[in-house]
Amino acid sequence: MQFSIPMTAIRHGTALALATLLLAGCVHPITMITETAPPRSQAHLIPKKVAYVMTDADRDKEVVTPGGSGDRVSYFPYRDLEKSIRDALRAVYRDVVVLRTAGDAKANEAAGVSLVFTPRITTDSSSSSWISWPPTSFTAEVSCVVTDAAGAEITRVRAAGNGTAEFGEFKGDFGLAARRAATRLTSQLSSEIRRSEKLR
């Protein structure tokens, strides 16, 4: 037995599939990595060895947020912002190392680590453009739980950065707004750490 499908149904189905595809949009990769770092003055560094926690699982976390024209952008916030976190700490402390876990008190003490920063990162993006996909606005926020070498919480620090970029500025640099946000976040994080009496 054979069944025939009316052409109108085929056309309607094709139109629906196309509309769904257009609504879903595309996902474009960008990077948040910035080469800009806060100034590091040896004379004003706090003579402590500190660590930040960054696991392989953190580095592999991919995030997708809105772009323009119905599209979205993807990136790896922990991997991309690791340099920013390290640069912020290096602007304050004499020695900075990375740890795979925050819970190894004996290893921390043996390494001479005084403070351990465990970051949690949130991001968001948007675009005012209906004709191009790169985000024109980007927000990045990092909140760090700071513990001593034994794992006891000392305090928490938070920093955020906002970045904007217009269509005419991109010139192939599609993550420009994200990198501007990362630059501001790095500067604010180092300032917040330096401001805290508990972290000196």
Model-derived regions, located:
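A structural "domain/chain start" motif
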Residues: 26-88, 192-200
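Short secondary-structure boundary motifs at beta->alpha junctions and helix caps
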Residues: 68-77, 147-199
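Generic short beta-strand segments
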Residues: 55-60, 120-126, 160-162
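Structured loop/turn residues at beta-strand edges in well-structured enzyme cores
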Residues: 21, 45, 111
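Sec-dependent bacterial lipoprotein signal peptides
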Residues: 1-26
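Surface-exposed short loop/turn segments
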Residues: 27-35, 101-154, 165
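Mid-chain, structured segments of secreted extracytoplasmic proteins
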Residues: 79-105
